[in-house]
């Protein structure tokens, strides 16, 4: 077979799961996303950032945005805010929505087109306003 067929064969669970989120990724401005199993193989050759995890059919996959797929200016802005973004994400996972919200706001001041940071910012706001209470899922794009 060809490379595409081999890739699909080797990573069929991940491919099936990611296919469900293609439109959400596009809407969030994510040009390329990979699971942790792929990112581990390519992280030394590419720039990327952890953006969260997805849950599907009993599986949980960590998701990385490949920043090399972005235009140069956008890529640089996301690289410049990567550490702040990941710290904000960790605060979100620790249910520190106030500090997480503040850091996501800082990320957006530097990189206003970061739709993933915007999504988490709004989710932090909802959690702070008790729309979700303690039952919030930390999964990316969960509704």
Where are these regions (language model features)?
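Intrinsically disordered, glycine/charged-rich C-terminal tails and inter-domain linkers
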Residues: 1-8, 19-20, 26-143
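A short beta-strand-to-alpha-helix junction
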Residues: 11-15
């Amino acid at each position: 077979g060809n490379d595409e067929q081999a890739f699909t064969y080797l990573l069929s669970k991940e491919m099936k799961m990611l296919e469900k989120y293609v439109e959400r990724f596009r809407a969030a401005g994510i040009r390329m996303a990979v699971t942790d199993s792929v990112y581990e193989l390519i992280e030394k050759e590419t720039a990327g950032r952890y953006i969260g995890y997805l849950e599907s059919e009993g599986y949980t996959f960590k998701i990385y945005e490949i920043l090399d797929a972005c235009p140069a200016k956008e890529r640089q802005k996301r690289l410049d805010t990567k550490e702040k973004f990941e710290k904000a994400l960790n605060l979100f996972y620790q249910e520190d929505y106030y500090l997480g919200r503040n850091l996501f706001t800082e990320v957006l001041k530097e990189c206003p087109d970061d739709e993933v940071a915007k999504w988490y910012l709004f989710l932090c706001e909802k959690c702070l306003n008790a729309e979700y209470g303690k039952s919030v899922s930390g999964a990316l794009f969960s509704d």
